[in-house]
């Protein structure tokens, strides 16, 4: 049975929502075990609450060592100036031991993201994230244009061939749209299908 981990960091809940729909898509594939976890928050709880960070997320916190237990990992992060969030970077910077062992070589890696604005760095966040995954020897999976949501021109929407994305709005008030969640589910399903093939 293939094992898929959806691992995310979310400040205000947008990436959390996307992660839940990524996991839903992955769970639609028979014979795949899906786990949803998050990376640790690095901001002290009182300070996090003061700036509106959603600290009551249900997903358990992952450990670095457990990454080796999965056949595929789908990473989710908000964008920080065109890069992944510091919390995710801090977590990944602790994976040197896994790298030394080649523990992630040949496993699937995929990324989804959130930005505050329409041109807020979604694609650079995902493609710069890929650098870390490639150093680990992971096999990168994105979202092909077979996913019809990528060519939706009827609304402002996230979604890239590199991975699912959402637009939070400058004040965080915009929630992931139906189209964005469809793309997220597609990505989760695609990764799970490929992981199942690789694990068989």
Swiss-Prot record:
Domain Flavodoxin-like: 4-191
Alphabetized GO MF terms: flavin adenine dinucleotide binding; FMN binding; NAD binding; NADH:ubiquinone reductase (non-electrogenic) activity; NADP binding; NADPH dehydrogenase (quinone) activity
PROSITE patterns per UniProt: FLAVODOXIN_LIKE
Cofactor binding remark: Binds 1 FMN per monomer.
UniProt entry tagged with the keyword Nucleotide-binding: yes
Cofactor annotation: FMN
The enzyme's E.C. designation: 1.6.5.2
Protein residues bound to FMN: 10-15, 79-81, 114-120, 135
Pfam families reported for this sequence: FMN_red (PF03358)
Cysteine-cysteine disulfides: none
Catalytic activity, as annotated: a quinone + NADH + H(+) = a quinol + NAD(+); a quinone + NADPH + H(+) = a quinol + NADP(+)
This protein's UniProt keywords: Flavoprotein, FMN, NAD, NADP, Nucleotide-binding, Oxidoreductase
EC category: oxidoreductase
Keyword NADP: yes
Tree of life domain: Bacteria
Residues bound to NAD(+): 12
Entry similarity comment: Belongs to the WrbA family.
PANTHER family per UniProt: FLAVODOXIN-RELATED PROTEIN WRBA-RELATED, FLAVOPROTEIN-LIKE PROTEIN YCP4-RELATED
Protein name (record): NAD(P)H dehydrogenase (quinone)
